[in-house]
Regions:
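Non-catalytic substrate-recognition and accessory regions of acyl/acetyltransferase enzymes
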Residues: 1-109, 117, 124-136, 143, ...
Length: 186
């Protein structure tokens, strides 16, 4: 199984903010979430232009959602989520901030709060699928696993992957109380 097929979460949670915050002005920006249905549209988000993976190559059973600014629909991050019926949870397949928000790879960022929003979107989908917010995924490394345990009170599972984590229903509800966005059903 390739890394794209398996999925992996390599995103830092920088600041817990209800909406996105501009790092220069401190302005708070409202956000919207929309599902990306077209694999052709996903070709815009490639590893070669800073999106960590080629998003059009993820498995077809993974739903992709975009977090965008409400005022101009500029995409700030993407999250891939799969309905994992066997685990009774949403599987957080991939999550990636836009290159202009990734200070770990590009040295600076336009907005803080993107990473937490992407986790909240996965929790939202879990509720939609009847799992009360439960989500699990594979952290990219031990440092990120510890980060998710510290920030989200995730639990270490390590059954399917050495850095597998689980966010239970209670912690997912806490996420959804903090992060605010609107759904854009286009």
């Amino acid at each position: 199984m390739t890394a794209i097929e398996q999925g992996c979460i390599d995103i830092w949670i920088d600041e817990i903010v209800p909406c996105l915050k501009d790092t220069v002005t401190g302005d708070i920006k409202e956000t919207v979430v929309f599902k990306i249905e077209s694999r052709t549209y996903l070709k815009k988000f490639q590893k070669s232009n800073g999106w960590h993976i080629n998003w059009n190559e993820i498995p077809k059973n993974v739903e992709v959602y975009a977090l965008a600014l409400k005022d101009d629909n500029t995409i700030q991050g993407l999250v891939g989520v799969r309905n994992d019926k066997d685990s009774h949870a949403a599987y957080l397949h991939w999550a990636c901030t836009a290159p202009h928000n990734n200070k770990h790879e590009f040295g600076n960022q336009k907005y803080v709060g993107v990473g937490g929003h992407l986790f909240a979107i996965a929790a939202d989908q879990s509720i939609e699928w009847g799992y009360e917010g439960a989500i699990h995924g594979f952290a990219a490394n031990e440092e990120l696993l510890r980060h998710y345990i510290d920030v989200f009170h995730a639990e270490y599972l390590g059954m399917l992957h050495q850095y597998q984590f689980f966010i239970d229903e209670e912690q997912a509800k806490n996420l959804l109380e903090v992060y605010h966005y609107e759904w854009n059903e286009t």
